[in-house]
Amino acid sequence: MLRKLTVDQINDWFTIGKTVTNVELLGLPPAFPAEAPREEVQRSEEVPSEAPTAQAQDPVKATALARPASAFGRSLSQRSSEVEYINKYRQLEAQELDIYGQDQPPSGPGLRSPLAKISNVACIPETTYKYPDLPINRCKEEVISLIESNSVVIIHGATGSGKSTQLPQYVLDHYTQRSAFCNIVVTQPRKIGASSIARWISKERSWTLGGLVGYQVGLEKTATEDTRLIYMTTGVLLQKIVSAKSLMEFTHVFIDEVHERTEEMDFLLLVVRKLLRTNSRFVKVILMSATINCKQFADYFAVPVQNKMNPAYVFEVEGKPHTIEQYYLNDLGHIYHSGLPPYRLEEPVITKDVYEVAVSLIQMFDDLDMKESGNKTWSGAQFVSERSSVLVFLPGLGEINYMHELLTNMIHKRLQVYPLHSSVTLEEQNNVFLSPVPGYRKIILSTNIAESSVTVPDVKYVIDFCLTRTLVCDEDTNYQSLRLSWASKTSCDQRKGRAGRVSKGYCYRLIHRDFWDSAIPDHVVPEMLRCPLGSTVLKVKLLDMGEPRALLATALSPPSLSDIERTILLLKEVGALAVSGQREDENPHDGELTFLGRVLAQLPVSQQLGKLIVLGHVFGCLDECLIIAAALSLKNFFTMPFRQHLDGYRNKVHFSGSSRSDCLALVEAFRAWQACRQRGELRHPKDELDWGRLNYIQIKRIREVAELYEELKNRISQFNMFVDPRHPVLDQEYPYKQRFILQVVLAGAFYPNYFTFGQPDEEMAVRELAGRDPKTTVVLKHIPPYGFLYYKQLQSLFRQCGQVKSIVFDGAKAFVEFSRNPTERFKTLPAVNLAVKMSQLKVSLELSIHAAEEIEGKVQGGSVSKLRNTRVNVDFQKQTVDPMQVSFNTLDRPRTVADLLLTVDVTEVVEVGHFWGYRIDERNAELLRQLTAEINRLELVPLPIHPHPDLVCLAPFTDYNKESYFRAQILYVSGNSAEVFFVDYGNRSHVDLDLLREIPCQLLELPFQALEFKICKMRPSAKSLICGEHWSGGANGRFAALVSGCPLLVKVFSIVHSVLHVDVYRYSGAQDAVNIRDVLIREGYAELAEESYESKQSYEVLKGFFAKSVDTMPDGSVSSPMKDDEKHLIQILLESFASNRLGAPNCKAVLHGPFNPYELKCHSLTRISKFRCVWIEKESINSVVISDSPADLHQRMLVAASLSVNETGSTMLLRETSLMPHIPGLPALLSMLFAPVMELRVDREGKCYTGVLCGLGWNSTTEAPILPEHDIELAFDVCFNVEDIVEINILRAAINKLACDGPHGPKYLGPERIAQLQENARQKLLGLFCRLKPREKITPQWHEKPYEWNQVDPRLVIEQAEREGGPGKSTCLYQLHTPVVLSP
């Protein structure tokens, strides 16, 4: 045995390629015990003894099977290079093993580790336990002897033979009886398996859970220092041994279900195998499975003995609990009569017919139960007292829900149906193990979670659709996708073994026998060959065992070299591995671990979420980022029930506020829940559940998020990252700045998941809406003839969206307009978003109607036929239904404006540039005096109906101590009062409900005299957007001061949807008039903007109108006899319909829509996805995005936290999205700020930057882009200069100071210094975006060679004098960019 290993020798051993010297060996190599025959697992003579075989088949062939698209595309030389890399490093490993070939640990039952210690358990209970009669019990002593005599033992036994539950207990009892120390760990692939087995053992043995036996799954640990048998998930054990670089904490390591071949499983086997041969030689390893490829695993764990590789010992557990009969579709001809279509390997699917076969089988089981109970005849009116349970294997939640619905409709069959899926709650999982009500049959609908992790003992029947969903990595994009595929024979055999635990079992495979034989694969493709390797490579780097490819070449199924290369590049892109300053020195197979990489390797979250946490620490928003990372790592705690999806969506939008970010909605909801708990409002479980239901939040999941949040806080504390307990000094702008910084941090963490939106065609959109306001209106199609008859049905369909103001019927189209609060800022109404969301959710909009011919036949002898497709306006505010003239809305001259120059008094400021007022010329003043006098002469009566928003009435207002009534519109009702808007003046007031009065009809005829104004050609500056809700508090205060205290002169530019777009002038003493827009722009609150297409059209029309004599203009208000006739016929029809003279509606009309032509479509910025179709998941706030400012051509940016692709790779699905503020140049700024490498584009004269190419850069050796798929090419739409690039570099350097290794790194800084660096980073970030003078707008110029690197003359590149950490050696998060010199 080894006398002594020094630290240096151990480190040398861990680094593949280094030789270990000066090792003293003692003792002779032991012989294997006589009771361990090895004939069945000996290697064939063809396998070289010095190279351990990883798998039965060629690893490169396995890779080809896993990735057919890439494998068939590879050249022969590329494939041979894959073989070379595996063979090279395996031979290296074999040579190093030769040093220790004679140094095997002595065998024998009395062996103990040198670190063995006496248990500190005060009293281990004497075992008088009688083991259940399972197959493994018959060979108990033999198995214990084998485990004690061998380093590695493989246990192969049928499902239900007792491997997982009994064997670890045998070892525990064996050591307990001898008063010897042991510490046994058993891995399970799933949490539910580890916890349920530990619970079962503790219950069987009457032990306290967490005492002698315990478990650890994820964040949940039920174990103490006295625990001697612990069950844990594969990942938990892997994290433990990677951190310790040793197995010596345990005496026995049981690895269960090794056939599953997950990435974690294969890496665990690799590390265990490595450690067994180095510093953990006394630990016993036991591999267990029912469907294991024994030779493959035995060869993999072979050890050199006397110049020969001896495979690990394989023990076969003979016998099965009970026989299991299996059947295929061929055997079920008596159930289905119509021929089922043949299955195809490339098209895994479940047809409706196959579902029906499964349902028929479940009904047939009563016959089987009766026959087995001895009752030969069964009438169907009775059931056996104990009906055996049925386990149905389905590929996913959607299929489970469909089958659940089929079975729950069979009420008379007395079935208790339970879903079993990773997303169901713990309580629902526990229901699976409960005995059913007597006389009822338990049906479990499960994914492959019940394949191995969960054993339900009373299952007699298994129905297997032979399908599964596997996580695969798309060849082109590297994005993950859950794909439906055929399960392997190994998995199906595991499923079969779930039956027959207590009696004879039956397994029904719903495929044909010949398809099983010829098409179903034998084994599952290992995850290491089909999934991203990021977390595995980081753990390899943490182990410091040399290049990742060197270690991974010794895996059971080595990943392809190209996959390792790609993983290294993706880790460099995220910043976990350093990007070399010298691109030609870049190692495609390795990289230096950065501070970020070390953090990521310790966190149980994805690389992007780990980066989010680190960037949150840098910019002082760590708490928010921890919440987001915890929430996105687990199942979404927002719930959107099937029939309440719109309500759930509305609730999520409410939590997001105006941020339009799913991530920020998570933060706000989590903090709202936390605040309620801290206030004691959720002290009782029922109160908490009620709060969750009210807010569409799943309480169990938000609690899990809280646990992970605390766990992440604890883990990052080792890196000197702490949430600041001090409350920040709050100023008016702080919450808005914090929100913006968090949005930027999200963009940094999720680079390069960047998307923009296509621009709507304004001209076409105006036509589609017939000139109506897109912010308040949606379009419906397929309106039936005489559609106006059904306006109440239509109104009720949209009631869940918002208050409908009017509906205009125009032929087969209808325009539904929602009420807008006149005192809220211009934006697309939430009601419009919800209406479009209804269309996206395919909510059925169905009307009960009369056939057109029936209406014409029953009313006035068919004279109403002229109304079949006439234009009709239903105004719910005025409660009128009137025919409409042909109108172009914005092109009509409004009757309320007699001149383009007006003098106004401002009565209500909504926000900067948006206000209400009224004309103060003599003519208008006289009109208002007469109106007020007429109102107050009348005998006013109380409202005949309950007040509601949008109702026009009369309300009191006191002016100069005199109370008078004025026309008003109710904005909202709260308790016994209402807020009203005075429609002739533009101001608002709170009024008691009992003071409101009904408005006489004649007072509604005069148009409302208050005017709504919007300053034209102006938009908020970046500073205003960042420091406020669209406009900053400072901007609002400055504007209010400019427009108050004196009359204003306004010059009308255009009239759009009854809003006057104007230039506003203020006279100040004897000075000239001051243009308020110019003042706001000069002071940095605003910037110039383009007017919309509608506004420009209106401007041209108004110029024409006022160029002519007003007297010659036609009066559009004059009613024509034809319209009077139409109105009379409409009233007749409405009365006939209301009085039911037409009879009951006998037809249905399904409407199409609703639509809004300004809805935006998303496009990816990365090269590989630029032309792929992009969908945003329906649960996202941004699944509906409607343009508020179509005239603004600057790109709007969207960031996605995660992406996946469909099975064909043609469509991308975005999840957890955030819509960034509409700041000109934002996509370019964020891309340059967070890209690993960038190359600036210049115009032909070299005088200005025209764009940028972002990515991992260019390799001058290979003369090719390093990661071309993720390159982002952008053309600038604002002007950037050298100073901007310098500012970006300064900010990147500021980030590095809080995200780097070394003696001056953040791990060694005090809290005050960290706070200073954080504030410095925040201020530099805000300074980059908030400029007094906005960046000049330019016309985008696309580079003539898009996506091509190395296009800049090297003589013009400004090399950075000092790169942090030195050239090519830096482990900082971001390298500094190289600016390009511009010509004067």
UniProtKB/Swiss-Prot annotation:
Residues 35-60 are annotated as: Disordered. SMART domains: DEXDc, HA2, HELICc, TUDOR. Residues 379-546 form the Helicase C-terminal domain. A motif (DEAH box) lies at residues 256-259. Gene3D superfamilies: 1.20.120.1080, 2.30.30.140, 2.40.50.90, P-loop containing nucleotide triphosphate hydrolases (3.40.50.300). Pfam families: DEAD, HA2_C, Helicase_C, TUDOR. PROSITE patterns: HELICASE_ATP_BIND_1 (PS51192), HELICASE_CTER (PS51194), TUDOR (PS50304). The keyword Hydrolase applies. The keyword ATP-binding applies. Residues 946-1006 form the Tudor domain. It catalyses: ATP + H2O = ADP + phosphate + H(+). ATP binds at G157, A158, T159, G160, S161, G162, K163, S164. Its EC number is 3.6.4.13. Keywords: ATP-binding, Cytoplasm, Developmental protein, Differentiation, Helicase, Hydrolase, Meiosis, Nucleotide-binding, Nucleus, RNA-mediated gene silencing, Spermatogenesis. It comes from the Eukaryota. One of its GO terms (molecular function) is helicase activity. Interacts with piRNA-associated proteins PIWIL1 and PIWIL4. ATP-binding RNA helicase which plays a central role during spermatogenesis by repressing transposable elements and preventing their mobilization, which is essential for the germline integrity. Acts via the piRNA metabolic process, which mediates the repression of transposable elements during meiosis by forming complexes composed of piRNAs and Piwi proteins and governs the methylation and subsequent repression of transposons. This is ATP-dependent RNA helicase TDRD9. It comes from Rattus norvegicus. The gene is Tdrd9.
